[in-house]
């Protein structure tokens, strides 16, 4: 099974890359966790933000192949407990399609991305910094895998 985090934003601090890779490498080879970065469009004082978000959304969707699952991370998505995420991970594994977890830029996801989403997931009702979200997703996917595999990491 292949899980991809498609996220707007690049050139993250080293601690973000290290945190992401720490959890990605802990997963078994049959559960590949990949990161695809979409460059954040420059937002100037007079920028047409709606157009920039639409362009970022198009770039995100261009990374998704037909038939792949899209799961958007949204403030108004469904909150999952660790056990619920483990259940979703197991269903995704049985479905055998690539799963694309979509994280938008500072203003969120393009409506076109949300419209293609099969599931909407909320990490928290809090506003979280995007660099931290990457690590949090990696850790939670790893934790969900440990629940499914009986690993003692999740106690």
From Swiss-Prot:
Keyword rRNA processing assigned: yes
TM segment ranges:
none
Cysteine pairs forming cystine bridges in this chain are none
Q: Does the keyword Magnesium apply?
A: no
* Subcellular location(s) per record: Cytoplasm
Q: What are the EC numbers?
A: 2.1.1.177
Top-level taxon in the UniProt lineage: Bacteria
| Reaction equation(s) it catalyzes | pseudouridine(1915) in 23S rRNA + S-adenosyl-L-methionine = N(3)-methylpseudouridine(1915) in 23S rRNA + S-adenosyl-L-homocysteine + H(+)
Tell me the keywords, alphabetical order: Cytoplasm, Methyltransferase, rRNA processing, S-adenosyl-L-methionine, Transferase
Cellular component GO terms, alphabetical: cytoplasm
Please classify the protein's predominant subcellular localization into one broad category.
cytoplasm
Q: Name one GO molecular function term.
A: rRNA (pseudouridine-N3-)-methyltransferase activity
Q: So where does S-adenosyl-L-methionine get bound? A: 73, 104, 123-128
* Role summary: Specifically methylates the pseudouridine at position 1915 (m3Psi1915) in 23S rRNA.
Q: How does it assemble?
A: Homodimer.
HAMAP family in the record, alphabetically?
23SrRNA_methyltr_H
Q: Give the record's family classification.
A: Belongs to the RNA methyltransferase RlmH family.
**What is the protein name stated in its UniProt record?**
Ribosomal RNA large subunit methyltransferase H
The record's gene field reads rlmH
């Amino acid at each position: 099974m292949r899980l991809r985090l498609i996220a707007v934003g690049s050139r993250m601090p080293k601690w973000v890359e290290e945190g992401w890779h720490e959890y990605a490498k802990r997963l078994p080879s049959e559960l590949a966790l990949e990161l695809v970065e979409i460059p954040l469009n420059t937002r100037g004082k007079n920028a047409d933000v709606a157009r920039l978000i639409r362009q970022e959304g198009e770039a995100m969707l261009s990374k998704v192949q037909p038939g792949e699952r899209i799961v958007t991370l949204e403030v108004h998505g469904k909150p999952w407990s660790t056990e619920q995420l483990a259940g979703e991970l197991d269903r995704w594994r049985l479905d055998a399609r690539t799963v694309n977890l979509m994280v938008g830029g500072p203003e969120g996801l393009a409506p076109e991305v949300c419209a293609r989403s099969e599931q909407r997931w909320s990490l928290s009702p809090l506003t979280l910094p995007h660099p931290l979200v990457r690590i949090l997703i990696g850790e939670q996917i790893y934790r969900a895998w440990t629940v499914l595999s009986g690993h003692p990491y999740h106690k």
